[in-house]
């Protein structure tokens, strides 16, 4: 995203009932089941969902007894999302598991022994980003797109009269106007939400207009002719009955809405030895702490890894010209020094070997507030602020 000058920028989001997000939810349900039984379990679970059909595939290493519970757990996940429709129902869906043992060739490069550090589970590049555009240090278009769908979910699941008739599948898209690189207003909003047969589109529009007005900053009003609700008309057939869904297909929604680079790796269904997930969380953690410390208004972090190698091959910092008298190369070295960026170091620092991943499967992995019971989203903490300021002043 160009962060200077005047421009329009758009981000989209999808709800927990979107087919790809249903797949993500089930994959993370499998992951949490294994981590609950064994914090050192290995999981790489892919899910396919379509009309009353769910297929699990991938590799695992963990307690055998967990396997026998997975179909019931997947069914409960579908129930919690809200699907009990003719074409996709938690009661009737045919759920099949093809999960099998993790490759020994991968395990020998990843497992730690007495004479070596634990290596990364694969090669790859991961990015983290933070910006002062919102209080959560997230890009504003994505933040508002996510929040709109979370509000609709709350109406639907919490018994609010405004949610009556709304169904789980939904999408949003928000376009903001930037002046001198800063968001100053909204130019368009698109929302498509599944609903019961016969529900008035005018009623849906009025409800969603109230949602949007309650979320956007004061003075930001979307023009009526640029406020699009179910633009194609009825949206009754949705979810996996309307479109097949796959794990890992919404990686931009999961991260920064296109405002920052993406290394290409998905998150859901992967245990934290997979640096696609854990290193992306670490990169966000570092970038957020840099911005929270007042060292820059924007920060992009890139980390890179090789399979079987414990330390990152590179740590790259880009402050996009917003640094406060900070040398980016020196800052990168400091970040690599104050946090152990090996796979095990990341997991230990952020306490990732726990069943904390189901809540990440929808509405974004970043910019989220932790659940006090789960103690999750640890990568959103800003506990490095004092350390970074002190290190730069040495």
UniProtKB/Swiss-Prot annotation:
One of its GO terms (molecular function) is magnesium ion binding. Gene3D superfamilies: 3.30.300.10. GO terms for biological process: one-carbon metabolic process; S-adenosylmethionine biosynthetic process. The lineage of its organism: Bacteria, Pseudomonadati, Pseudomonadota, Alphaproteobacteria, Acetobacterales. Homotetramer; dimer of dimers. L-methionine binds at residues 59, 102, 243, 274. InterPro entries: ADOMET_SYNTHASE_CS (IPR022631), S-AdoMet_synt_C (IPR022630), S-AdoMet_synt_central (IPR022629), S-AdoMet_synt_N (IPR022628), S-AdoMet_synthetase (IPR002133), S-AdoMet_synthetase_sfam (IPR022636). This is S-adenosylmethionine synthase. Its cofactor is Mg(2+); K(+). Binds 2 divalent ions per subunit. Binds 1 potassium ion per subunit. Keywords: ATP-binding, Cytoplasm, Magnesium, Metal-binding, Nucleotide-binding, One-carbon metabolism, Potassium, Transferase. Pfam families: S-AdoMet_synt_C, S-AdoMet_synt_M, S-AdoMet_synt_N. Belongs to the AdoMet synthase family. GO terms for cellular component: cytoplasm. It is found in: Cytoplasm. It comes from the Bacteria.
